[in-house]
Curated annotation (Swiss-Prot):
NCBIfam families: dxs, PRK05444.2-2. PANTHER family: 1-D-DEOXYXYLULOSE 5-PHOSPHATE SYNTHASE-RELATED, 1-DEOXY-D-XYLULOSE-5-PHOSPHATE SYNTHASE, CHLOROPLASTIC. It comes from Baumannia cicadellinicola subsp. Homalodisca coagulata. One of its GO terms (molecular function) is magnesium ion binding. This is 1-deoxy-D-xylulose-5-phosphate synthase. Thiamine diphosphate binds at H80, G121, H122, S123, G153, A154, N181, Y289, E372.
C-alpha cells in the first residue's frame, strides 16, 4: 500500500490528525475524495466492513480536523464505520491487514491505538462510556471534550436511551452525533437546515440565549413562557428535536453529513457549547460507490472483490448449506403447519438465515431492532399467551439478555426456543464476537435444555425437539459455517438427555459436544477410542457417562466453548458427585479472549483441529 499512496497526494499529507489539522480547510473536499477512493481500493483487496465507512468519510475528517484528538475523546459506536478513522490515525499502511490474524483489529481497540479511546464491537455502548469520560473531564478541569458517534440503528437499543436520559439529567459537556444513514428519522435535509444548524450552534445565538436566561431569572412565569415559545418555534422548523430536547439535550440538525466544510463549521461552534448536545447528521451508507449505495446491506461486510465489476463474488465455496440456512429452512417448514410459531430476531435477519421466512411469513416475523433484552421478554409474553416463540440470536449477543433469560423465561418455565447462531469460534470479528461462553452461562440456569448438534441433520432434529418441548426453555447452539453433507432424516423428537455412541473403542472415551465430531472421529481412530456424540449439554446422559467411567481408563471431553464452566465441567461435576475416580481431560476454548483470524487459523492455534486434539491427548497421557 505504501507504493500506492502517491496516487493520493492530499491523503499522503494527512497520515495522522496532527498533520491533518495543518491542511487548509479548502483541501478537505479533496482529502475526502481521496480517502473514500483509498478505502475502496483497500477493502476490495483485503475484505472487511465497507459500506458504513464510505458513509462516514466527511464526518471522520471533520472530527479530527476540529477536535484535538487524542487529547479529546472521540468514540465510535460498534465500530463498523471506523475504517476511515483508522486510516487517518497512523494505521494507513496496515489497513490491508484488518480482520486478519495478527493484523489490525476489525473495530476500534484500545490496545491498538491511543486514538481508540474505547474498545467496541457490540452496539450502543458509546454514550454510556462517553458520559463517564465527560464526567471525568469535568473533574480534571483541563478542557477535554468528548464526542460519541452513534448510528440510527444503534440508537434503537435501550442502553443508548438510558445513557441519554442520564446525560440530560446531569448536564455534563457531551456531544452525541447521531449518524442517520437510513433516512429513518427525518428527511428534512438541505440548505435551510444546514443554515439553521449553523445559527443554533453559533456564538451570537448562544450569547443571546444565555443573556435571556439571566434576564428572566427570578421571573418564573415569563421564563417558562419564553422557553415554550422557543421550543415551539424550533419544533416548527426542526420537528425531530422534541424527544432529545425532552431528554435534556440541545438538538441541532438534521444536517448534511457529506458537507465536510459545513460539518467543520458546525463542529467548531459545538465544541464551545456547554451541556449535553445532540447533532443529527444525515449520511448515505455506501456513499461514493454506486453498488453499495443501491444495496448497503449486501455491501455492509464484503470479501475481496473487483471494484470495476461492482458485484460480490459468490462466497459459499461449499456445496453444503450453512447452519444459518439450515435453521431458516427448518423455520419455514415448521411455520407452514403452525400459525402460532413466531420468529424473533434482534436486527440479524440476514445473518441468522431468516430473510426467506420474513418474506414468506411476515405476520409471524418480528425484527425488534438492536434490543436483545426486549426480544427475550417479548418472547416470554408470547409464550404466556399460548404462542411458540423462536428467538434467533448470535451467541455473543445473547449475553446482553442474560437476566431476561433467567428472570422472564426460565423461572417461569416458558417454552421459548433459542436458536443460538455463531456458537464457538466465529473468526474475523475478534474478541467481541466469538461465541465462547454460551454453554457456560446457560448450563447453570435451572429448567434449561441445551443441545449441541454435530451436523446439519442433527441441527434440524434438535430444533424440532426444542420447538416441541413444553416444560421450559430450550436452546440449540450451532456454529458459523457449513454443514458436512449428511443426508436429512425425517424429523422426530429426540429423547432428552440421550447420547449416541459413534465408535466403540478401548481405554479412552471421547465425549464430544457439537460440530468438532468430524475432527474427533480421526482422533478416536488413532487412539482406538470410544467416541460419543453427547448431543445434550443439559440434561447430560448420566447413565452413559457412568458406564464410560467404569469401563474406560480415561475420559476426554471436547467442545468449542470455554473450558471453564462448559459442557466438560458438567461431566466433571457429575463424576465427583458420584465419586467416580477416572482421569478427565477437558478440551475447549482457553481462558482468554480470542482475537481475530480465520476459523481455520484459530482452531489450529488453539489445537482444536484433529492434529491439535491428538497432540493435547498425547501430552496428557504422557504425564
Amino acid at each position: 500500500m505504501s507504493m500506492q499512496i502517491k496516487r493520493y497526494p492530499t491523503l499522503d499529507l494527512a497520515d495522522n490528525p496532527i498533520k491533518l489539522r495543518l491542511l487548509p480547510k479548502e483541501s478537505l473536499l479533496t482529502l475526502c475524495d481521496e480517502l473514500r477512493q483509498f478505502l475502496l481500493t483497500s477493502v476490495s483487496g483485503s475484505s472487511g466492513h465497507f459500506a458504513s465507512g464510505l458513509g462516514t468519510v466527511e464526518l471522520t475528517v471533520a472530527l479530527h480536523y476540529v477536535y484535538n484528538t487524542p487529547f479529546d475523546n472521540v468514540i465510535w459506536d460498534v465500530g463498523h464505520q471506523a475504517y476511515p478513522h483508522k486510516i487517518l490515525t497512523g494505521r494507513r499502511e496496515c489497513i490491508a491487514t484488518i480482520r486478519q490474524r495478527n493484523g489490525l483489529h476489525p473495530f476500534p481497540w484500545r490496545e491498538e491505538s491511543e486514538y481508540d479511546i474505547l474498545s467496541v464491537g457490540h452496539s450502543s455502548t458509546s454514550i454510556s462510556a462517553g458520559l463517564g469520560m465527560a464526567v471525568a473531564a469535568t473533574y480534571e478541569g483541563i478542557g477535554r471534550k468528548t464526542v460519541c458517534v452513534i448510528g440510527d440503528g444503534a440508537m434503537t437499543a435501550g442502553m443508548a436511551f438510558e445513557a441519554l436520559n442520564h446525560a440530560g439529567d446531569i448536564k455534563s459537556d457531551l456531544l452525541v452525533i447521531l449518524n442517520d444513514n437510513k433516512m429513518s428519522i427525518s428527511r428534512n435535509v438541505g440548505a435551510l437546515n444546514n443554515h439553521l444548524a449553523q445559527i443554533l450552534s453559533g456564538k451570537l445565538y448562544l450569547r443571546i440565549n444565555e443573556s435571556s436566561k439571566k434576564a428572566l431569572h427570578g421571573m418564573p412565569y415569563l421564563k417558562e413562557l419564553a422557553k415554550r415559545t422557543k421550543e415551539q418555534i424550533k419544533n416548527i422548523i426542526v420537528p425531530n428535536c422534541t424527544l432529545f430536547e425532552e431528554l435534556g439535550f440541545n438538538y441541532i440538525g438534521p444536517v448534511d453529513g457529506h458537507d465536510v466544510q459545513g460539518m467543520v463549521h458546525i463542529l467548531k461552534n459545538m465544541r464551545c457549547m456547554k451541556g449535553p448536545q445532540l447533532l443529527h447528521i444525515i449520511t448515505q451508507k455506501g456513499r461514493g460507490y454506486a453498488p453499495a449505495e443501491k444495496d448497503p446491506t449486501t455491501w455492509h461486510a464484503v470479501p475481496k472483490f473487483d471494484p470495476a465489476i461492482g458485484q460480490l463474488p459468490y462466497q459459499n465455496i461449499s456445496n453444503y448449506p450453512t447452519y444459518s440456512d439450515v435453521f431458516g429452512d427448518w423455520l419455514c417448514n415448521a411455520a407452514t403447519s403452525n400459525k402460532k410459531l413466531i420468529a424473533i430476531t434482534p436486527a440479524m435477519r440476514e445473518g441468522s438465515g431468516m430473510a426467506k421466512f420474513a418474506n414468506q411469513f411476515p405476520q409471524q416475523y418480528f425484527d425488534v431492532a438492536i434490543a436483545e433484552q426486549h426480544a427475550v421478554t417479548f418472547a416470554a409474553g408470547l409464550a404466556i399467551s399460548g404462542y411458540k416463540p423462536v428467538v434467533a440470536i448470535y451467541s455473543t449477543f445473547l449475553q446482553r439478555a442474560y437476566d431476561q433469560v433467567i428472570h422472564d423465561v426460565a423461572i417461569q418455565k416458558l417454552p421459548v426456543l433459542f436458536a443460538i447462531d455463531r456458537g464457538g469460534v466465529v473468526g474475523a470479528d475478534g474478541q467481541t464476537h466469538q461465541g465462547a461462553f454460551d454453554l457456560s452461562y446457560l448450563r447453570c440456569v435451572p429448567n434449561m435444555v441445551i443441545m449441541t448438534p454435530s451436523d446439519e441433520n442433527e441441527c434440524r432434529l434438535m430444533l424440532h425437539t426444542g420447538y416441541h418441548y413444553n416444560n421450559g426453555p430450550s436452546a440449540v447452539r450451532y456454529p458459523r459455517g457449513n454443514g458436512i453433507g449428511v443426508e436429512y432424516s425425517l424429523l422426530r423428537i429426540l429423547p432428552l438427555g440421550k447420547a449416541i455412541v459413534c465408535r466403540q473403542g478401548t481405554k479412552i472415551a471421547i465425549l464430544n459436544f457439537g460440530t468438532l465430531l468430524t475432527q474427533a472421529k480421526k482422533v478416536a481412530k488413532t487412539f482406538d477410542a470410544t467416541l460419543v456424540d453427547m448431543r445434550f449439554v443439559k440434561p447430560l446422559d448420566i447413565e452413559l457417562i457412568n458406564q464410560l467411567a467404569i469401563s474406560h481408563q480415561a475420559l476426554v471431553t471436547l467442545e468449542e466453548n470455554a473450558v471453564i464452566g462448559g459442557a466438560g465441567s458438567g461431566v466433571n461435576e457429575y463424576l465427583m458427585r458420584q465419586r467416580l475416580l477416572v482421569p478427565v481431560l477437558n478440551i475447549g476454548l482457553p481462558d482468554y479472549f480470542i482475537p481475530q483470524g480465520s476459523q481455520e487459523e484459530i482452531r489450529a492455534e488453539l489445537k482444536l483441529d484433529s492434529d491439535g486434539i491428538m497432540e493435547q491427548i498425547k501430552q496428557w497421557l504422557a504425564r
